[in-house]
A protein has these predicted regions:
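Active-site/acyl-donor-binding loops of N-acyltransferases
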Residues: 155
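Basic, often amphipathic N-terminal segments
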Residues: 1-67, 87-148, 161-173
Length: 173
């Protein structure tokens, strides 16, 4: 079966996190760029038809393009991530898609709260501590990462590698 996901790419973070993601984030090795997940899992690829694509286009158009920054590292139990601020644009996208597709909650409903984030690495505590220190030093000398979100991206993994299906431009800012 071919899963799909909706993401917002964050290319601005790559210079800081790509080396960690390649080693400690399996999704990076499967062709997923630095991103904020809007909704995963989404539909199976065979369920994505013209009507779904049109609906996603309308959802994206209903959310204004937005700027954000990445300056703070945070943790989940076995993950290190960058927290986008403000995170309201990402939350608005997740909420809008979930309202339109209520049978597909974010992360299959595993978590009571969805936290927009850019994953840096998964690992044990010592590994994550080491990466976090290195990342904070690099970001302190390089300045705040400033990003701009202008599109929602539908990706699929029918080949074992995630590939782009369609990009949906966000509304004018």
């Amino acid at each position: 079966m071919a899963d799909t996901a909706l993401i917002c790419r964050v290319p601005e973070a790559e210079r800081y996190i790509s080396r960690y993601r390649e080693r400690y984030d399996p999704s990076a090795r499967r062709n997923v760029p630095a991103h904020v997940t809007v909704l995963y899992p989404f539909l199976q690829l065979h369920e994505v038809d013209a009507g779904v694509l049109a609906q996603l286009g309308q959802i994206a158009d209903g959310v204004r393009r937005f700027d954000f920054s990445l300056s703070e590292t945070r943790r989940f139990p076995v993950s290190l991530y960058l927290w986008p601020q403000p995170d309201t644009g990402f939350s608005a996208l997740t909420d809008a898609v979930w309202r339109a597709f209520p049978d597909h909650p974010p992360f299959a409903g595993k978590f009571p709260t969805v936290v927009p984030h850019v994953t840096v690495a998964h690992g044990d505590e010592p590994t994550l501590c080491e990466i976090e220190v290195e990342l904070r030093i690099a970001m302190a000398s390089g300045g705040v990462v400033r990003g701009h979100c202008s599109e929602l991206v539908l990706i699929e993994n029918s080949s074992g590698r995630w590939e782009e299906v369609r990009c949906f431009p966000l509304g004018a800012s």
